[in-house]
Each structure stands twice: as C-alpha cells, then as structure tokens.
C-alpha cells in the first residue's frame, strides 16, 4: 500500500518547485496553470515537451478500417514490399533484398495488432537477428528506419537513398512499432493499451514466437535486442522475458546473446541526480545554479524509493518531483536542444522529422505497406501517458541475472545528450551489483577506434561494456553512423577492441595497454 501521507508531501513539493524554479515557463506551453489540478495538468504539460511528443492520440480504429494486412486470427500476416523512388545512386536493386512489412495480432488483446518492418541482411542470411526498439514511450521505430540505422535515408525531395551504414549490412533487422498504439500499430479497443513493462515485454515475446515460426531458418541465428532512450526500460524487461521463456522451454528457443541500450533511461535513482552534474560539466549552468538543484536531489531519490518497482500514484509523484531537476537545468540552458546540446532546439521536436511523416502518409507508400488509412504519427502522447507510472521504476534490477547467465550487455551513450546523458548511464552501470562489479570498476577506459581514429571511450569486462561515443547526441546511429555500425558488428563478434592489443598514450606520458 502506498504511503499517501508522504505522497501529499511530494505533491506540495512540486507546487513549491513550480513557484520557485523559473523553468515552468519552459516545460509548460501555458505560463500559468491551476495548481488545484496540479498532478494531471503538470503531467500532461510535461508529456508534451519532454521527449519527442506531438499531441496526437493513439491508433484506435474502427473494425471497418482494418489494414489490408490485418490478421484474421492470432498470428502474422507479412508481405514483401517495394518503396517508390527508392534507388537514387546505384547500389543493390530491390530484387536483391528481402524487405518485409507486416502485422501481428496480439493473442492477449481484444483487437490489437503490432506493425513491424523486417529487412533481410544485405550480405549473409545467417547473420544475427537484431531487433530495434525506439523509446518515447510511444515513439515509432520508423524514426530509426529512416534517420538512424535502417537500410535507407529519406532525402529532402522525399525519395530514399541507400544507407551505407545501415545495420542490415551485418544483421537481419527487425523494427517494431510498440507499445500498442504507436506508429502503424493499432487496436480496436482502448483496453488493449499497455501500462507497464510486463504487458510490453509479453507482447514482444509473443511477437517473436510468431515471427520465428514464420521464419524458422532465422530461429537458429543469434539474437540481439537493441534500442535507445525509453527503450532503456523496454530492453531489460524484454531480455528477461526471452530468457525466462528459454529456461522454461516455452515455444521456439530464441538464441539470445546480448542486449544493447543507447542513451537509455534504466535506473532513474542514479540517472536523475546526474542532471546538475552533467549540466555543470558541460557549461549549461553555473556552480550556484548547480548547488540549488542539488538540494532537490534527496527528495527525488526518496520519491523514487517510494515508487519502487511496482508503485503507481507514487511513481507519478516521483516523476513530477524529479523532473524538476531537468526543468531547472533547462531554465538556464535556454533554447538548447536537450538531445544534442551543441545545437538549438528548433520546432516542437528539436529535430525535423516531418519528411518521414509525409512519406509514410503517401498513398503509394501506404499501398505498398498494406496499412490502410491509419494516420502515421512519429510519437503518441496517449501511449506516453498510459506508461507514465512506469517511468520512474528501476529496470536495472533484472540485468545482473542476465549477465551471470552469460548474456552480454552493451550500454553506449553519445557525449552531447542531456536528457539521457552518458554520466547518469555510467553511474548505474558502475554501481550495478553483479559478480564482475569490482573488476569492471577497476577496468581501464580505452579508445574505441574506427578507421584509426578515436570514436569513443570503452570500458569492458566479461559480459558488460560501456561506450561513451564522441561527437554524438541522443541518437548515436544518426550522428555517428559508421561508428555505430562498427560498434554493433564488433560487439556481436565479441571484439569491441579492434586489435588484440591496443597501445595508446595515457596522461603523463605513460602507456595504457588494453588486452581483449
């Protein structure tokens, strides 16, 4: 039972924060709001501007408007597709590639279907299967398809050009629109919307079972889970669900070898207090501003403790309190892009993804994909709201078991991202309790080399690796596509350090030798 007395204290604290930190004018579209309705109003306003959230509803459609590829019963309906205007400057022809799109009707739902893309590897059919999950919660994985690591990039004239550094170069690549209501995924009943990682991970596990039943040859391949941002919640829960299914001999055995989290939110208790420290280090705030924000940290930490792993109302209160740290930084940072502090935030998303939305709403594209009349939006506010109580929960708790059972974890983070910064990610990775904690903590950072140049700083011990990526923000595959592809390839080959022995000049003229 949640401690409502302390919850009341937390909500009064949010009122105090709103009146003392000028950041409320940054995070709120309206500069004034009714404090009597603080929790719902504040939460709704925060939703709209904190993390890639246009103000559209989730895809709840009428049965008469079901997509052409909708499954009649639980299972997958998949088709090969060809995008219009895809070949720009040579490269492989569409006939050489296996591009698939489909819907999976969720068995544990009233009328929900998840949309997915599947791109066969350009080179080796026995390459690992990699699934990518975009965060949000409620943001479509098509963001990654067209702007990060998919087979092609969308150009200014709405045509597609081949992506030289698409992850389908080294893997069979899956992108799923999830949770239900995200992107082209839809439901005919609002009761299907998910509110926690249990529902999300069960849906993804059911999808994988159906996908490998549809593609039995791929079930023999190694399998990796990847993603970024709020996928720092999805990925550990999903990996644990797959591992649990394997141990219980449920359905098709999935050869889970590892999972990778890019600029994720995984352990809020260690990541939120990093906001003032990161902002000070990067020159976004002064020491005085840092010290003022530090006074909020203890109550943020206490509110997260109240939230625990299964709280509800207390987790919403924790979200409101702890985001005062983020909003406090932003009130002094001005119009900085919190996904890449080297840039200014332009538009409601800080990035311009409008060409993708226009492209995916073209009738020719819709016909190719078989998605019917579903309106595509990059991110769903309603999905975000539904998952809000999940935000402050700690998803690190299930990771040690996976590491102990030999499943690899790579955490990577672009150095210029504020919202899921490398410092907070480094802290939870180093603090995690597992048998290799001491040795990982003692491991030296070594350069991550791409084409003879340092592309990041790498720390690794046995199954656990942490990579700070140079010259990148929140979306590493977008900012550093070549380094991101090299990272994925080497990680799957268990060779993140390129050579058997790397010698680099360390501070003070000493030499640091990194052994694989």
Swiss-Prot record:
* Organism per entry: Arabidopsis thaliana
Role played: Probable carboxypeptidase.
Tissue expression notes: Expressed in roots, senescent leaves and flowers.
One GO cellular component term, please give it: plant-type vacuole
Q: Which InterPro entries match?
A: AB_hydrolase_fold, Peptidase_S10, Ser_caboxypep_his_AS, Ser_caboxypep_ser_AS
Q: Name one Pfam family in it.
A: Peptidase_S10
Gene3D superfamilies per the UniProt record, alphabetical: alpha/beta hydrolase
Disulfide-bond pairs as recorded: 139-379, 307-322, 345-350
**Full protein name:** Serine carboxypeptidase-like 49
């Amino acid at each position: 039972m949640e401690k409502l007395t302390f919850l009341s204290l937390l909500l009064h604290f949010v009122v105090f924060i709103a009146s003392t930190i000028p950041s409320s004018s940054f995070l709120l579209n309206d500069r004034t709001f009714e404090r009597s309705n603080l929790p719902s109003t504040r939460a709704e306003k925060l939703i709209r501007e904190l993390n890639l959230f246009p103000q559209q509803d989730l895809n709840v459609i009428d049965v008469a408007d079901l997509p052409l590829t909708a499954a009649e019963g639980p299972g997958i309906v998949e088709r090969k597709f060809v995008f219009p205007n895809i070949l720009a400057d040579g490269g492989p022809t569409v006939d050489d590639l296996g591009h698939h799109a489909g819907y999976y009707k969720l068995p544990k739902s009233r009328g929900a279907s998840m949309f997915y893309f599947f791109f066969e590897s350009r080179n080796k059919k026995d390459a690992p299967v990699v699934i990518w999950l975009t965060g949000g919660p409620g943001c479509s994985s098509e963001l990654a398809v067209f702007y990060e690591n998919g087979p092609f990039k969308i150009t200014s004239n709405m045509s597609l050009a081949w992506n030289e550094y698409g992850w389908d170069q080294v893997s069979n690549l899956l992108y799923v629109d999830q949770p239900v209501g995200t992107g082209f995924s839809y439901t005919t009943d609002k009761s299907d919307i998910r509110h926690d990682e249990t529902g999300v991970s069960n849906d993804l596990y059911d999808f994988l079972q159906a996908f490998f039943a549809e593609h039995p040859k791929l079930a023999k391949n190694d399998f990796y889970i990847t993603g970024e941002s709020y996928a720092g919640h999805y990925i550990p829960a999903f990996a644990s669900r797959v591992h649990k299914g394997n141990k219980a001999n449920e359905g098709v055995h999935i050869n889970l070898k590892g999972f990778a989290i890019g600029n994720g939110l995984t352990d809020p208790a260690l990541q939120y207090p990093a906001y003032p420290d990161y902002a000070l280090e990067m020159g976004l705030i002064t020491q005085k501003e840092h010290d003022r924000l530090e006074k909020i940290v203890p109550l943020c930490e206490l509110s997260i403790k109240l939230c625990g792993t299964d709280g509800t109302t207390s987790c919403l209160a924790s979200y409101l309190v702890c985001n005062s740290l983020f909003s406090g930084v932003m009130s002094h940072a001005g119009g900085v892009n919190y996904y890449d502090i080297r840039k200014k935030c332009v538009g409601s998303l800080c990035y311009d993804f409008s060409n993708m939305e226009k492209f995916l709403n073209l009738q020719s594209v819709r016909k190719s994909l078989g998605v019917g009349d579903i309106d595509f939006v990059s991110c769903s506010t309603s999905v975000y709201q539904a998952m809000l109580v999940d935000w402050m929960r700690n998803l690190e708790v299930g990771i040690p078991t996976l590491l102990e059972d030999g499943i690899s974890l790579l955490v990577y983070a672009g150095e210029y991202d504020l919202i899921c910064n490398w410092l907070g990610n480094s802290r939870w990775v180093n603090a995690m309790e597992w048998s290799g904690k001491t040795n990982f903590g003692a491991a030296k950072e070594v350069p991550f080399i791409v084409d003879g140049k340092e592309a990041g700083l790498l720390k690794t011990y046995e199954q656990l690796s942490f990579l700070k990526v140079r010259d990148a923000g929140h979306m590493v595959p977008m900012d550093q596509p070549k380094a991101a592809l090299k990272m994925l390839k080497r990680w799957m080959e268990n060779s993140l350090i390129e050579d058997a022995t790397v010698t680099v000049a360390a501070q003070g003229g000493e030499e640091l030798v990194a052994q694989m």
